[in-house]
Amino acid sequence: MTATEEPNRCRIVLIAPRIDDPAKLKSLISAAAEGGDVASLILPAYGDGETAFQHRAETLVPVAQAHGIAVMIEDDTRIAGRVGADGIHFEGRKNGLEELIEKFQGRMMIGTGGAKNRDDALELGEARPDYMFFGRFGYDNTPSPHPRNLSLGGWWAEMIELPCIVMAGNEIASVEAVAATGAEFVALSSAIFAEGEDPAAQIAAANVLLHAKAARFEAGE
């Protein structure tokens, strides 16, 4: 899907799963990318050392970018630069985010997460990142999105101009609840990559639901 064909409604952000086998992970991401519209892919570090994390990023970034999917690397600017990623996803305090934005915004996208309440989110938002993420990597282990993430996403989407991403649950149908908040993006991981699932079919199904249920945004929103 080209930029001119991007849908004007809530879109999918993939969170790469915690899988140690690079070949298997590459196959899963490639299959998901074939399933339909995906806006971006976030690569969490999952506690890996620098060498292992960089190898994973080197494996996945070209696959995603070949399908027009922007790739965000969690926290490590050196790895992001080495592998030609599109941006950094930062989980931390406002001062760290401000420093990151000062150094890299303009060259890379800078997104953030980790807010547990409205005050946290507003403090991080003052740094003007490219997006706010509500949720935690690896915690999409229930069918529905976490109520706190839905609440924060709905409040943010209504009150703040910066785009937000809300973590969905481990069932595809949960994208509807996220889209209903007005969030610009819905994050999916276990719903796509669970053992036995077809990532392409799951992405296609999620896009069908979003196309049918998600509100349309006005131009410029």
Regions found by a protein language model. Give the residues of each.
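Flexible, active-site-adjacent loop/turn segments at secondary-structure boundaries
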Residues: 135, 190-191
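Glycine-rich anion-binding loop/nest that anchors nucleotide
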Residues: 133, 164-170, 187
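Conserved N-terminal beta1-alpha1 strand-loop-helix module at the mouth
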Residues: 1-89, 94, 103-130, 161-162, ...
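Short capping loops/turns at secondary-structure boundaries
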Residues: 114-117, 146-149, 168
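Flexible, gly/pro- and Lys/Arg-enriched active-site loops
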Residues: 92-98, 136-159
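Internal alpha/beta core interface subdomains
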Residues: 183-185
